[in-house]
UniProtKB/Swiss-Prot annotation:
CheB-type methylesterase domain mapped to chain residues: 187-378
Gene Ontology process terms (BP): chemotaxis
UniProt subcellular location: Cytoplasm
Bias-annotated ranges (Low complexity): 156-168, 178-188
Record family assignment: Belongs to the CheB family.
GO CC, one annotated term: cytoplasm
Domain Response regulatory: 4-121
Entry remark concerning the domains of this protein: Contains a C-terminal catalytic domain, and an N-terminal region which modulates catalytic activity.
4-aspartylphosphate: residues bearing it: 55
Protein known as: Protein-glutamate methylesterase/protein-glutamine glutaminase 2
EC number of this enzyme: 3.1.1.61, 3.5.1.44
Pfam families given in the database record: CheB_methylest, Response_reg
Keywords for this protein: Chemotaxis, Cytoplasm, Hydrolase, Phosphoprotein
């Protein structure tokens, strides 16, 4: 059965091109289009698409507000289009917080110059997030302010980026949650003297990382490295966001940074992050031969070489199998590898690769991973 898609964008050119690209895939059917957030809600209710592609800046109602309403009234996987700017990153992260599943940079130049590459990426994303559809029937999100028909508002509601007057290290704010999934069956972990916690993730990762990291105390005794598939323009904003929400410190990694307890370093987009035996971070240019920049396998592999059996590696929600080969090296050295369970993943790809390769020492639900990291390390 074809994946039914609703395309939402106020640009006539972009609506047409996205519709044409998707319609060229025989397994995708564009069932409708909308020019603003209010139309998107009406069309989502009427057409019941499997996936919605959504722009942010639109008249009458912006994309984030529309996502919030859609998640409340007819939960549907949403793929956001975003500009490759710091502000675009902030807006995209707000949209993911509101319930969107994934995002793609909105790059008109790429559409003109690399249509086949754009088609492959867009169709792959649509197919991937459509498979998360079954998880959306249980979505629980805060009720929108307006009902029953959303009223146009000029700007999105304040995001969890907060104002500059917010406390430097507030109590962690809960991430938007779907209804709790059944807990995985692995027993609680035993405490070990880990020298490093390494977490890799992709689709669904921004919200998942927020959920995990906000459970860690400021006194967390181990350094943390984070590898999230994300464009170069986005990782700094994401690190800043996590730093405001968490009790630990979070920053985008820079070449020469030194690992220390209570600090999480986020691999910069478009580059690779490695760890040496002295606990120093090396940031390398992204290798065009690798699909992912940053790549979980690269960081996990360097950690395996530098820390032997003293790494706790966690693979969270995401497409593909990045992290599997790095996890294999970690296991060969005696380190511990956990995977997120299928029920709580947005996309059960990366964790599934770990489980199928028999590399997982434990499988936990997302809501349990943070507390189990604390139990294992503190």
């Amino acid at each position: 059965m074809a994946v039914k898609v609703l395309v939402v964008d106020d640009s006539g050119f972009f609506r047409r091109r996205v519709s044409e690209i998707l319609s060229a895939d025989p397994s995708i059917q564009v069932v409708g289009t909308a020019t603003n957030g209010k139309e998107a809600i009406d069309q989502a209710l009427a057409l019941k698409p499997d996936v919605i592609t959504m722009d942010y800046e639109m008249p009458m109602m912006d994309g984030i507000t529309a996502v919030r309403h859609i998640m409340q009234r007819c939960p549907t996987p949403v793929l956001m289009f975003s500009s490759l700017t710091h502000e675009g990153a902030r807006v995209t992260l707000d949209a993911l917080d509101a319930g969107a599943v994934d995002f793609l940079p909105k790059n008109f130049e790429d559409i003109s110059r690399n249509p086949e590459k754009v088609k492959q990426l867009l169709c792959e994303k649509v197919h991937s997030i459509s498979r998360s559809n079954r998880r959306f029937s249980a979505y629980s999100a805060p009720a929108p302010a307006a009902a029953p028909t959303p009223a146009p508002i000029p700007a999105a509601a304040p995001s969890s980026f907060g104002s500059h007057s917010a406390p430097a290290r507030p109590a962690p704010a809960p991430a938007p949650t779907r209804a709790p999934a059944a807990s995985a069956s692995s027993p609680a972990p035993k405490r070990k003297n880990y020298k490093l916690v390494a977490i890799g993730t992709s689709t669904g990762g921004p919200v998942a990382l927020q959920r995990v990291l906000t459970q860690l105390p400021a006194s967390f005794p181990a350094p943390i490295v984070l590898i999230q598939h994300m464009p170069a323009a986005f990782t700094k904003a994401f690190a800043e966001r996590l730093d405001k929400l968490c009790r630990i410190s979070v920053k985008e990694a820079e070449d020469g940074d030194i690992l220390r307890p209570g600090l999480a370093l986020l691999a910069p987009g478009g580059k690779q992050m490695m760890i040496d035996g002295r606990g120093a971070v090396k940031i390398l240019p992204g290798d065009e031969r690798l699909n992912y920049k940053p790549c979980v396998d690269i960081t996990f592999g360097s950690a395996a070489k530098s820390y032997s059996d003293k790494v706790l590696a966690v693979v969270l929600t995401g497409m593909g199998a990045d992290g599997r080969e790095g996890a294999r090296l970690l296991k060969q050295g005696g380190s511990t590898v956990w995977a997120q369970d299928e029920a709580s993943c947005v996309i059960y790809g990366m964790p599934m690769a770990i489980v199928k390769a028999d590399l997982a020492d434990a499988v936990y639900s997302l809501d349990d991973i943070g507390k189990h990291i604390v139990e294992a390390c503190v």
